[in-house]
């Protein structure tokens, strides 16, 4: 067997139905589109979500909530990322310099994801309850 001689099994593929090619084909004249209407015309169809002029569902439903603009100033750092950093004292500037948080970050919180074995002192950085316990268990502190 050669790659260029592989063929699908006999009868597994069907030829595409040719429409609009005479009455004897069973799909002549209107070509399975029925009579008149927007869907029978060439190039004629509505956009997704259009309900014929009726107020569409996404506009009938009320708006909910908002997206906080403060989120872009908040950042999270995992315990495993803190472990790889290898610093004894960590503050916002050190995290920015290491590239763990963005330049516009103003608030950083350490979250408990991964393990930490080195003692780390955090200055001006928050931590979740689980992360705080893990840091203190490793001999670190949070100031």
Swiss-Prot record:
Q: Does the keyword rRNA-binding apply?
A: yes
UniProt cross-references to InterPro entries, sorted A to Z: Ribosomal_uL15, Ribosomal_uL15/eL18, Ribosomal_uL15/eL18_sf, Ribosomal_uL15_bac-type
Q: Which domain of life is it from?
A: Bacteria
One example GO MF annotation: rRNA binding
Cite the SUPFAM superfamilies for this sequence: Ribosomal proteins L15p and L18e
Q: Which Gene3D superfamilies match?
A: 3.100.10.10
Renumbered to this chain, region (Disordered) spans 1-56
Q: Which Pfam family name is an example for this entry?
A: Ribosomal_L27A
Q: Which GO terms describe its biological process?
A: translation
The answer to whether the entry has keyword Iron is no
**Compositionally biased region (Gly residues):** 21-31
Can you cite an annotated GO cellular component? cytosolic large ribosomal subunit
Q: Keywords of this protein's UniProt record, alphabetized?
A: Ribonucleoprotein, Ribosomal protein, RNA-binding, rRNA-binding
Which PANTHER family does this entry report, sorted A to Z? 50S RIBOSOMAL PROTEIN L15 (PTHR12934), LARGE RIBOSOMAL SUBUNIT PROTEIN UL15M (PTHR12934:SF11)
Q: Which family does it belong to?
A: Belongs to the universal ribosomal protein uL15 family.
Subunit info here reads: Part of the 50S ribosomal subunit.
Report the protein's function: Binds to the 23S rRNA.
Q: What's the protein called, per UniProt?
A: Large ribosomal subunit protein uL15
Species name for this entry? Delftia acidovorans (strain DSM 14801 / SPH-1)
Its gene name is rplO
